[in-house]
């Protein structure tokens, strides 16, 4: 986890991860028999540069265990997964806890898989469930060939 979730939403939720956690200092990309995969945690998905770093490091998929709350979940959950998938032409997989209205922190839920075209392949609701979806890495390659966003980047123009 590189980015700590410290928020105070007016008429919404207050939460400060920095009270108990220390942020990481690098992106995590690892080798598997299917290719490289990345992992980011929850709030990290809100930083496009972090997903881009993983994609440029060769990640074919990024796994995101996350627990968006009842304020940010409805507004941003699906949107951020679709945007990171589309921006990087990569599969994004979000795993979220089921909603428990009796808990101190109430999660939005809605585990999700998005494809490199930015399409939601499958999404659960707020209840307990298991999300199973077949990932086609050849489709990722085809999308990157047809619309070569990463190759067309002009990194010399960007101030990151």
Tell me the role of every PLM-derived stretch.
Residues 13, 22, 37, 116, ...:
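Short, functionally important structural connectors and interaction interfaces within domains
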Residues 138-160:
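A short C-terminal boundary segment appended to hydrolase-like catalytic domains
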Residues 29-31, 113, 132-134:
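Short, well-ordered beta-strand micro-motif
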Residues 1-57, 70-79, 147-149:
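Active-site catalytic loop in hydrolytic enzyme cores
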Residues 5-11, 130-141:
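Short, surface-exposed linear segments at secondary-structure transitions and domain or protein termini
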Residues 2-5, 98, 117, 136:
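Short, solvent-exposed coil/turn elements at secondary-structure transition points
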Residues 36, 45-131:
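CN hydrolase (nitrilase-like) catalytic-core segments centered on the catalytic cysteine
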């Amino acid at each position: 986890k590189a980015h700590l979730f410290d928020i105070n939403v007016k008429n919404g939720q207050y939460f400060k991860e920095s009270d108990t956690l220390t942020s990481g200092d690098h992106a995590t990309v690892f080798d598997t028999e299917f290719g490289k995969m990345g992992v980011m945690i929850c709030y990290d998905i809100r930083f496009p540069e972090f997903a881009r770093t993983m994609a440029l490091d060769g990640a074919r998929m990024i796994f995101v265990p996350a627990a968006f709350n009842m304020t940010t979940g409805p507004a941003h959950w699906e949107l951020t997964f679709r945007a990171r998938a589309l921006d990087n032409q990569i599969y994004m997989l979000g795993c979220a806890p089921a909603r428990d209205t009796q808990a101190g922190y109430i999660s939005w839920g809605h585990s999700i898989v998005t494809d490199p075209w930015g399409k939601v392949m499958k999404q659960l609701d707020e209840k307990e469930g298991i999300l199973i979806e077949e990932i086609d890495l050849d489709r990722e390659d085809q999308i990157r060939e047809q619309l070569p966003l990463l190759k067309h980047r002009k990194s010399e123009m960007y101030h990151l």
